[in-house]
A protein has these predicted regions:
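Short, well-structured active-site flanking segments
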Residues: 27-29, 180-191, 259-260
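Conserved, well-structured interaction surfaces
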Residues: 47, 55-61, 94-183, 199, ...
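Helix-turn-helix repeat elements of alpha-solenoid scaffolds
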Residues: 133-137, 211-218, 258-268
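Short, surface-exposed recognition loops and adjoining beta-strand edges that mediate ligand/DNA contacts
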Residues: 37, 63-90, 189, 224-239, ...
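Bacterial Sec-dependent N-terminal signal peptides
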Residues: 1-31
Length: 280
């Protein structure tokens, strides 16, 4: 009897601990109080997030010069998280056009064409576009007509935010082009994937090419005409330029030449009135 009573007592204690540890679990809130409801409550909030999306191509995080990187995981913030630097390294160091004389980890493997999947520089340039795309997807989820109306955003503010959706989609297409150009395929997520619920899929070269091409053509009318956008923001010329580059390398991407299309969009860019600096 004593043994049975002792077992019952022990069972009761365990149940009590379990119940107490689960208490109010549904009442927990994010540690970061900048929830979408707060961040996107005003037109200024939308523009701040859009600026962050553009900024992912040049900055490494939200604090300067370093200390709060967007991407963790033991990667060096200066050399392995910065998009421009990593993209340059991957594109140029394997060629005879550039030399890196530093001994930073595996950087010289790019010269020797002997990098591996565990290379920290490659991990960084894989993670960066996917991180950027994740931000863009959230922006697209939160900038629908329904969300703007629910938040009382209307008039010129709503018009600018709707226009910015085309810019965000361009930047997403650009990031996917980076993945296509460097890796040949990519993890794929868009605004229909709910954060924390859907596992990301994967797209092949052909699928990525088709997605990028269709996105750039779909947003052409939504982007500002050439040289009319606010400084630093993309316009139709950016979409034409990326389409020209996509078509120029189509033989590598999908096995089919699209030189005629490349010429068509290159001519659009040239006709847009862009010029080289007089002294460069």
């Amino acid at each position: 009897m004593k043994r049975i009573s002792r077992n019952k007592l022990l069972l009761g204690v365990v149940i009590a601990l379990i119940l107490s540890s689960c208490a109010k679990k549904l009442d927990l809130f994010p540690v970061n109080d900048l929830t979408p409801e707060k961040t996107f409550s005003t037109a200024a909030g939308y523009k701040s997030v859009l600026a962050k999306i553009y900024g992912t191509l040049s900055i490494t995080g939200n604090a300067g010069p370093a200390g709060a990187p967007d991407i963790a995981g033991g990667l060096d913030e200066g050399s392995q998280v910065a998009f421009i630097r990593m993209f340059f390294n991957c594109q140029e160091l394997p060629t005879d056009e550039a030399v890196c004389a530093w001994n930073d980890q595996t950087i010289k493997d790019f010269h020797g064409l002997k990098w591996t999947s565990s290379d920290p520089f490659l991990k960084g340039i894989y993670a960066r576009p996917i991180y950027n795309i994740t931000l863009i997807n959230e922006y697209l989820r939160e900038s629908t007509d329904e969300k703007l109306a629910a938040r009382g955003i209307s008039g010129a503010d709503a018009t600018d935010i709707k226009k910015s959706r085309g810019e965000a989609r361009f930047l997403r297409a650009y990031n996917y082009w980076v993945m296509l150009d460097l890796f040949g395929k990519s993890t794929f997520i868009d605004e229909s994937n709910q954060v924390g619920t859907d596992l990301p899929g994967e797209k092949s070269k052909t699928e990525l090419f088709a997605f990028i091409e269709s996105e750039l053509k779909a947003i052409e009318a939504e982007l500002g005409t050439v040289k009319t956008a606010e400084y630093g923001r993309v316009d139709q010329g950016a979409a034409w330029s990326l389409l020209a580059r996509l078509y120029l390398n189509a033989k590598t991407y999908i096995g089919t030449e699209k030189n005629t299309e490349a010429i068509t969009y290159a001519k659009k860019v040239i006709a847009g009135g862009y010029t080289l600096h007089s002294n460069y």
